[in-house]
Amino acid sequence: VSRQRVWGVPLPIFVHKTTKEILVDDMVNENIASIYEKEGSDCWFSDDPQRFLGNKYKAEDYDKINDIVEVWFDSGCTHAFVLEKREDLQWPASMYLEGSDQHRGWFHSSLLESCGTRGRAPYESILSHGFVVDGKGLKMSKSVGNVMAPEDILKKYGADILRIWVASSNYEEDLRIDY
């Protein structure tokens, strides 16, 4: 569930230098949570470890771990942070809507996290759509030179043509475009 990166949501873990035991202390965890609520979690990477430990422990006795939460695990938890925290939304979601690349990404990580913590999926259904690809069916890429900016199409043909094309297309398949 972790990665070694310099960006992302940090895992607030201290390991005792001598015993190699992970520090488990509710007061320290509450202090870290309080700081995160006010300032965000990026302070973990820059602030003095003593600030998080408080007066009960000495920073020189602990290694501060700088691993981050694995990004798919992080995104898989969003249902809890969004749907369960907002009164105008309901949990589980009616539908998760994303591209087919998310079968092994967001759909999968959300399903695993939610089933593990709540015993069911965080959504009632999922809807997968295809992607807009070039006229040959290839993924658009700046390095290949086959990218078509929607603004260019709008300038040449107008918004209504683009809307009609999208609305009349089968969302389950990749949409080929060439002009």
List the predicted regions and their residue ranges.
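Structured secondary-structure scaffolds
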Residues: 1-179
